[in-house]
Amino acid sequence: MQTPKLIRPTLLSMAILSSMAWATGASAALVPPKGYDAPIEKIKTGDHSFSCEAIPKPYTDKLVFRSKYEGSDKARATLNAVSEEAFRDATKDITTLERGVSKVVMQYMRDGRPEQLDCALNMMTTWAKADALESREFNHTGKSMRKWALGSMSSAYLRLKFSESHPLANRQQDAKIIEAWFSKLADQVVSDWSNLPLDKINNHSYWAAWSVMATAVATNRQDLFDWAVKEYKVAANQVDKDGFLPNEMKRRQRALSYHNYALPPLAMIASFAQANGVDLRPENNGALKRLGDRVLAGVKDPSIFAEHNGEKQDMTDLKKDPKFAWLEPYCSLYTCSPDVLEEKHEKQPFKTFRLGGDLTKVYDPSHEKGDKGDNDGS
């Protein structure tokens, strides 16, 4: 049957409008959640005690490190003190850089001193120019360090790139060098963590996806954004109907800790996706909410996890407030209950270098408490 002539222009118009809308959507620049546009708090010009610490030596060697769980069985739940010390020693320069960038960016966003901006950018450009962390020789612990470092730096850098104070306006050459380096590292992280069998996909993959999401926005790369979203969906579909992650339940006495550790990258990815018009909350029937609720219930009553895997839970890590930094993006995605909000406010501010610094300043600035908090995150 022929389409009536009167309808043809309408269909054509719809097609044109549809293609225009698609083109507009495809070209829209990626952005972080709203709080990342915050200006410098108060520009200070008087005497100060700030001094830029020595930049750690760029790590250009192969990324092969001992695991802190060396000698443990498949559960990877028993720490080896000797190998942990060796790991900390071998990766010291990397973690010093991560912590340093995060700390100095926070200081700059508070005080606005040019010396602070110089310090943060010099740390990153020094490592970028040395092609640090790019080695193709790595083991599992090594590729883990690469994605952690990338996530730490790129998420701190977002505070500079998107601030309405425009601190990078006159530092475009530095920005170009840093973003090109982040981009290369992200490509390698994608390669490192792609196509793993489902039984090998756990919190490490989620943290890799977070580092790629932060870099996607820092470098405006849609392909990286799409990969992070894809990995999030894999993670969400690992959450069972009761809110447990089977691969993290294998961690025996540390199962609850690792469920909690899985939440920061997933909540951040969902928050960043939402800022760019992608709502990941419905994935696998609200998997992120289910996981968050299960962890919060487990923290109140660890026997929930003990009954599920037969192991009394080690609560050591869960006594550290920064371990709950995921509550900031989580409570921006969902309406948290009054008791959860009360707990969140008691623990604030949440400063964790692996998520780029002070998340309370980004997500809940009215509850910021100045210098409280230690920027934990390991």
Curated annotation (Swiss-Prot):
Signal peptide feature range: 1-28
EC number: 4.2.2.3
The reaction(s) this protein catalyses: Eliminative cleavage of alginate to give oligosaccharides with 4-deoxy-alpha-L-erythro-hex-4-enuronosyl groups at their non-reducing ends and beta-D-mannuronate at their reducing end
Catalytic class of the enzyme: lyase
GO terms for cellular component: periplasmic space
Annotated positions binding substrate: S67, K68, H140, T141, Y258
Record key words, sorted: Lyase, Periplasm, Signal
Family: Belongs to the polysaccharide lyase 5 family.
Name of the protein: Alginate lyase
Gene that encodes the chain: algL
